[in-house]
Amino acid sequence: IQGILNGTTNYMLTKMRQEGWSYDQALQEAQRLGYAEADPFNDVSGQDAFKKLMVLSDLAFGEQPDWSEVEVIGIDTLTLDDIKAANEKGLRYRHVAEVEKNADGKIVGKVAPMLVDREHPLFPIDDVFNAVSMETNYIGTLTVTGPGAGMYPTASVMVEDYAEIIGKRAGFVVSI
């Protein structure tokens, strides 16, 4: 499983690439638009994506990797020059969270900036959108996308989660 799990960082990387904005300019605009918190540490450091990755790992594999072994690198390590150089080569930086079961059966994960080419399913995902791409046994690669930053996507997810929890307690399935 690989994914862009934080819409704020994806927005910032998109604006740095498309508009030539510095990291600070992209962050300030993300904050102004309500995509980033006043303290953006959890977003830009990769901690938010890490926590979401642990949930995905539980859903996919029924367990999580050892948290202390998951490398987490934020987007603050990237410069505008890095992004421009990648773009000139037809590549894009994405802040990717990934988890897999290795050959030994161990669950391993990582969150870090990653260069992707046009063939990668995360290549076209821009702005505040999130995406999760999964390799499946029967249908190949399955990629799901949707908005991932801002007040409405956050509120929507909270309502859906609340309805699901209440539905499970009452013994029925809620679909929103």
Stretches with model-predicted labels:
Residues 119-176:
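ATP-dependent carboxylate/acyl-activation modules
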Residues 8-11, 36-37, 139-141:
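A short, flexible beta-alpha/helix-coil linker loop
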